[in-house]
Amino acid sequence: MDGADGTDLANGTDGRGGGLRAHIGSFTSGGGRGITSAAVDPATGALTLLSATDAVADPSYLTLDRDTGVLYAVSETEQGAAAAFRPTPEGLTALGPAVRVGGSGPTHLGVAGRRLLTANYTSGSVSSLPLAADGSFSGPASVLAHEGSGPDESRQERPHAHQVLPDPSGRWVLSVDLGTDSVRVCAPDPATGALRLHGETVLRAGTGPRHLAFHPGGEVVYVLHELEPQLTVCRWNAGSGQLEPIDEVPVASAAVSGAVRAYPSAVVPSPDGRFVWAAVRGADAIATLSLADGAERPRLVGSVDCGGSWPRDLAVDPSGRRLYAANERSGDVTWFDVDPLTGQPRRAGSVAVPAATCVVFV
């Protein structure tokens, strides 16, 4: 296992210097190295591995606070924890020990002001942790428990919060619950930062919503479902905190859906708002949806192989020209050049990262 101080992976290259970095989460329980740091070639998008840290177990999801430059990771374990890191040219430096989040099996996290939010899948709750000015943890978590269940007795026997993130306005926090087929809208308490339920949007029963993304315009939300290969398109009103479903769009063709059991995992829009991509496990594919002529409802226009097995997450590089897939079961990160006219990804390369789960650019 690589050392907590950042084991060198670059065959004698120390990784010093500027430029874009990618940080890759993984399941240490599945053979992963923890968080792997890589340099990104600006011309080709190729990743060169620099170092890895196993300072936290099962860092399956990462997020960057762009105000402080601090990188946060969940520890997707029964105890449930989060950790904070300061990126360096060589890799990552931990900002103190990991802290408990007050829930079990956190799968996602986001930053809202001076609070870190986590979605706790196993316990079906969302947590809010206070942060100091330097991005370190400054107090215990407050926890908001979800309630309810769904028709799938094997996956929806109780709440399973899978994602939590602030809306673009910063006024609201949205949490996606696979177990209750719903998206909850919360408002942080002005005095304590604790989350208070504002409203709940119930989606089609049994579809298991997993992950959502905002269109760059901020008024449309795409909710990806895990238990059916569908994307729900919603209108978002930041003034009232209301989420309104308006359409469902497939992310896999009927032929693909009939041949394999598809488990969609992640959805990301292009920075220019013209395309939406969805990772589909089982089919091991990346679906491309087009928003031609400014339409708010995308349509499926194609699908490509993800370059590995079980794509758990997708990330678009800051230029918007490349797409990266974290393929958990094949243990690699594959990158694609994006056709600017069609949005279709074309495989350009890959690098081995055991049990890869997430990619974040710094």
Where do the protein language model's features map onto the residues?
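Asp-box/WD-like beta-propeller blade repeats and closely related beta-sheet repeat scaffolds
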Residues: L92-Q163
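Short coil/turn segments that connect the beta-strands within blades of beta-propeller domains
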Residues: G19-L20, D67-G69, R114, S169-R171, ...
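Short loop/turn segments immediately following beta-strands, especially the blade-tip
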Residues: A38-G45, F85-G91, L129-S138, C186-A194, ...
